[in-house]
Amino acid sequence: MSAILSADDLNDFISPGVACIKPVTQPKSELNPQHVDSSSTISETGEVEIQIDSQGNPLEISQIDTKINKADPSSTALTPAQISLADCLACSGCITSAEEVLVAQHSHHELLKAMEESSLASGTEKVFVASISQQLRASLAMAYDMSIEEMDKLLINLFVNQMGFQYVVGTSLGRKLSLINESQGMIHRKEEGKTIGENLKNPVLSSICPGWVLYAEKTHPYVLPYISTVKSAQQITGCLLKNLTAYERGIGKSKVYHLTIMPCFDKKLESARPELFANHDGADNVPDVDCVLTARELVTLIDESLGKYQLVPKVIPQTLLRKDIAEVYKSAAPTNWPFVQYSWSNDPGSSSGGYAYTYLRLFQEQLITTQNYRPEDFSMKVLQGKNTDVYEMRLLHNGNQVASSAIVNGFRNIQNLVRKLKPGNNNNKVGGLAIKVNPLVARRRARMSKSEDSSGASASSMAPAEIADPSKVDYVEIMACPQGCINGGGQIAAPAPTSTPPAAPAPAHAATSTTDVKIAVVLNKDWVSEVLMKYNSVPMFDLSLHPEEIAGFIQWSQEFEKEFDVSEQRLFKTHFNEIEKPTDATAIMVGSKW
């Protein structure tokens, strides 16, 4: 693995597949022409041998020529096998993706290469634009010990004044449109279910995290019908930014290069997912995102530039810091970019976007508006799960539950959830879902029950506290990273712990490395908590408190769709497919199972 991302950074890690199962084929166009047109095309299907020439290049030697035609064997140069991000999306060989492919195809080297090629082009220069996530801003602000506002000014200065980007925007506009569509879809589902009497047993599962979605596609396809098809902020922002930039500059969308800075490496894979709802004429097949970098990769780019690019100059111009932040945001955005005042804002709820929280609050607002409920009659109840990465939120009206959602972070917790959603489990069914009871837990509960009976204590007074059960809620916000997106794999890690000399010589068998690991884990948890505080310092804009603005967002998006001939499905919807398991015996033998 690369120095940027390694398994040592992860505490909730599932090993990738041992072998890539994508078939290696030699395209016909790359074969020697004199054999492509032959009557038997035996060079394609006949007996061949691979040899290395004097230059170290691999050659395919046809043995059939010497056996049948008694001629000198023909040779064909072989090209290196290449794997694209699209291949990773359609391959079940790894749990999410091959990290080398992510770094190779969406790296700062590729960005710099594109910038150099554009500068050398004559009349075909590209316009470079960037979008920046809230988690990235918090990570960099923490790493450089700055406020969010100061970091935003420096980021815009880096991209616009040093790297020559035309526009820089926050991803908040895309996120708010994603939140609105996700919440409205949930509210419609809930109201429609009541109308037709449908028993909504299984929850809707979020699709914002590409790592979780790929895991479901490759290992648990039975949950795909439950996964929401609403796009993430990254993809919605990309569609908006490319169309608006192309229109303003009078160029085609293919001439706009969109870089987005995200907290997670798997966001690179999300950008490679093909569009299902693109226009049939092919004009809309331009990707919404051309390159995804993480905080770590951005810092690496700056370090390797040898002073050409500086995020934090040695002497920061005071004129830059004194600028009004609202004016800085406005000057960096396209002139036709809407809601500039909200485009760098944050949203209440989790550090992954607040999807679970926003759904409950917008549903509450819906009930107040349509059912004449009083706001003071609502309350929110939070139930903790078996660990801090699982919790449930219940919206109560006069003490009665009217809606619920949950947060599930980390692959261990995700595995527990999808097991409960697996059809056909009949052991100890509760609410239509199979729950396996640990025998040791059952015996312990039995002993506790006997103890309560003998002591005369009432069952109600000794009842255990409720534990969150995400399998029974309306909506689950799922993130592959423990602690959510604020702890994404591409975020700046905590500084390495400084070891102090021990008071006494340690025994020869002492496992000092284990101690260092424990210290690192504690430091990382504290570090992530500090980054979360930075994240929460981003000015909040609660959609549920501004229903009139929600109407404005919806109206603007509808006008955008008409003006740019972009369908609602193209702007807001994505798709998922079951990834078929390999049938090749070798791949099955060396592959991994999860």
Swiss-Prot record:
Instruction: Report the protein name in the record.
Output: Cytosolic Fe-S cluster assembly factor NAR1
Q: What superkingdom heads the lineage?
A: Eukaryota
Q: Which GO terms describe its biological process?
A: iron-sulfur cluster assembly
InterPro entries in the record: Cytosolic_Fe-S_CAF, Fe_hydrogenase, Fe_hydrogenase_lsu_C
**Annotated GO MF terms:** 4 iron, 4 sulfur cluster binding; iron-sulfur cluster binding; metal ion binding
Species of the source: Lodderomyces elongisporus (strain ATCC 11503 / CBS 2605 / JCM 1781 / NBRC 1676 / NRRL YB-4239) (Yeast)
Q: What's one Pfam family here?
A: Fe_hyd_lg_C
Task: State the residue spans of region: Disordered.
Answer: 444-465, 492-511
List positions binding [4Fe-4S] cluster 2.
Answer: 209, 264, 481, 485
Compositional bias ranges of the Low complexity kind: 454-465
SUPFAM superfamilies xrefs: Fe-only hydrogenase
